[in-house]
């Protein structure tokens, strides 16, 4: 059986990147929560 994690930078950025987060209301909510928590990295 192959491993389930087959990394792709493009897919990663499109699904979890900063611009993907900013594109939706809930995505902006995630970023706000991560800022409030003091995360060093906000998005992938």
Curated annotation (Swiss-Prot):
Q: Where is it found, in Gene Ontology cellular component terms?
A: ribonucleoprotein complex; ribosome
Any GO MF annotation of the entry:
structural constituent of ribosome
Q: Where are the transmembrane segments?
A: none
Q: Which Gene3D superfamilies match?
A: 1.10.287.3980
Name any Gene Ontology BP term. Answer: translation
Q: Which PANTHER family match?
A: LARGE RIBOSOMAL SUBUNIT PROTEIN BL34M, MITOCHONDRIAL RIBOSOMAL PROTEIN 34 FAMILY MEMBER
NCBIfam families documented for this protein: rpmH_bact (TIGR01030)
For this entry, the protein name equals Large ribosomal subunit protein bL34
Its lineage reads: Bacteria, Pseudomonadati, Pseudomonadota, Gammaproteobacteria, Oceanospirillales
């Amino acid at each position: 059986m192959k491993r389930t994690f087959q990394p792709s930078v493009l897919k990663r950025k499109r699904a979890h990147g900063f611009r993907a987060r900013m594109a939706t209301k809930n995505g902006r909510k995630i970023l706000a929560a991560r800022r409030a928590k003091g995360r060093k990295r906000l998005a992938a």
